[in-house]
A protein has these predicted regions:
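Hydrophobic transmembrane alpha-helices of secondary-active transporters
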Residues: 1, 49-53, 68-91, 105-113, ...
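Alpha-helical membrane segments and immediately flanking helix-loop junctions
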Residues: 1, 126-166, 173-212
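Entry/N-cap segments of selected transmembrane alpha helices
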Residues: 1-7, 42, 88-114, 124, ...
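Hydrophobic core segments of alpha-helical transmembrane domains in multi-pass membrane transport
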Residues: 2-15, 42-55, 73-80, 171-172, ...
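Intrinsically disordered, low-complexity non-transmembrane regions of multi-pass membrane transporters
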Residues: 11-48, 188, 192
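C-terminal ends of transmembrane helices
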Residues: 13-20, 80-91, 116, 142-143, ...
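Interfacial helix-loop-helix linkers and transmembrane-helix boundary segments
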Residues: 19-25, 35, 59-66, 83-100, ...
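Cytoplasmic-side transmembrane-helix entry/capping segments in multi-pass membrane proteins
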Residues: 38, 67-68, 92-104, 127-133, ...
Length: 233
């Protein structure tokens, strides 16, 4: 919560002092109530899916890895939309606002990790390591389990997984006025799991920001996690 809070404050300040241009791809501007409904729909879909998986696990035996293939198809169609709207791959990867959002996000994550370490009376390097996952729970949990054991690995897993869950609410609610906050709070998932949600909430024009931001937040976690977890406590 401390790391997420630091991200929110830092990214909202960035949005306030460096506001993005008004969205052009949305013909009708969504009201706050409509955005809240969209957030609840996304969260409700996750809850219903989880319940169905639990209640009907004997009947709903989906092929292993099908979620990955569905995600690949969704991202494939996002790529088609980018090209159809005249946005090149270079523009998507080297987007200035996306890169700046990634820097602000990384700095506030590490700052939040330091604050969390003081509040929870843990070593600073451990707080920095937990902050370095940036939403990449499948990576952070493995690295920190190998470094410090299953308890710390589980903490890293739930810490980063909670970011993805919070994103379901934040993206639709903040996209209109706090674009970098809406995208930045997703962390490393901006380039894969939450990319279709970002595109739906903000239109195709915000996709380059998400992709550029996602590249930053996918390159740094492996380096930072290994570095901080290798420092003796």
């Amino acid at each position: 919560a401390i790391i997420l809070g630091a991200n929110m404050i830092g990214l909202m300040l960035y949005d306030l002092f460096n506001p993005a241009e008004p969205l052009k791809s949305q013909g009708k501007i969504d009201s706050r109530w409509h955005s809240l409904i969209d957030s609840l729909k996304l969260f409700g879909t996750v809850v219903i899916g989880t319940l169905c998986g639990f209640l009907f696990k004997s009947y709903l035996m989906l092929p292993t890895g099908i979620n990955l293939y569905v995600l690949i198809v969704l991202i494939f169609f996002v790529g088609i939309q980018l090209r159809n709207n005249g946005i090149s791959l270079k523009e998507a990867i080297f987007n200035k606002r996306g890169f700046q959002t990634g820097i602000v996000f990384t700095f506030t994550s590490l700052l939040g990790g330091i604050i969390a370490a003081f509040v929870l009376a843990m070593p600073i390097t451990q707080g920095l390591a937990f902050a370095s996952g940036m939403g990449w729970y499948s990576l952070s949990s493995v690295v920190l389990t190998n470094a410090w054991g299953p308890v710390q690995g589980s903490i890293a897993f739930f810490n980063d997984l909670s970011r993805e869950i919070v994103s379901l609410f934040v993206i639709p609610l903040f996209m209109r006025h706090f674009r970098s906050t809406a995208i930045g709070i997703t962390g490393a998932t901006a380039i894969d799991c939450t990319l279709p949600i970002i595109q739906k909430a903000g239109g195709i024009e915000v996709t380059p920001i998400a992709i550029s931001f996602g590249f930053v937040t996918n390159i740094l976690p492996p380096l930072l996690l290994v570095f901080f977890s290798s420092i003796p406590l």
